Amino acid sequence: MKMKTRKNLKVLLFLLPILLFAVVFVYYPFVRNIVNSFSLVNAKGEIRGFAGLENYRYTYGRKDFPQALKHTLLIAAINVPATLIITISLALLANKRRRLSPLYETLFTMPMSVSMSAACMIFKSMFSPSVGIINYVFGLNLGWFESKETALAACLILTIWMGIGFDFLLMLSALRGIPSHIIEATRVDGISPLRRIFRVQIPLISPTIFYVFCTNFVLAMMTSAPMIIIMGVSAESSATNTLMSMMYQSGFSSSDYGLAAVLSITAFVLTLGFTILSFVFERKRVHYQ
């Protein structure tokens, strides 16, 4: 019994650092955020009283909230399928041409080596109305980030590009994990390459696709960096306002911690609801070997 107690104590000691980290930086902020959403919080972050549902009524009644929610859901609806289609296509290309695979891996994982702030500055220069290469190639004269009509599309392109590298590696690893005898059997049976992709390879890598699908949705819901770094608080920033960028501006620019807490709780509930639905869908469409 003493040996078992000592063993459990050793395990607890090894787990203690990560448990402390989780409590201090994950669980406490999460609980405090819930408390703030129902409280009157001053500019110093001090709770001054109980607000009930007043913060929620105020947040959901703001004119900019529906637009921020719409932009957040739109980014998720476009970003997730676009990233999946692009990364699966690139992985299939790299997996097919093994001799050029090292070159493809270097090129397609390049976004991983660029920080978000640097990528924002690069894309802002590329989409510049005066010196941008995008306007030069297509013969346009658009201020992509300066126009309310195109700012969100430009931010979307940036977020998709930033997410390609890591997801490409996951898809490529999954494809290379398919047993070679299965692929050989499809060739012997005379199955066309296109049918092999949709009937054999994609079903076999469906667990990886499901993982990328869920994580990309969460990341898309949390998208705020391009909107904050590039758009800032300009007049055009409303065209790219999301729940997270609105939360950032409320918490760090306006010190309205009650509003920021409600926005973060809203994003959390939406993400949690989608995740639950995804796992229900997983039982029917995801095939584990």
What do the predicted segments below correspond to?
Residues 4-289:
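A structural signal for multi-pass alpha-helical bundles of membrane permease subunits
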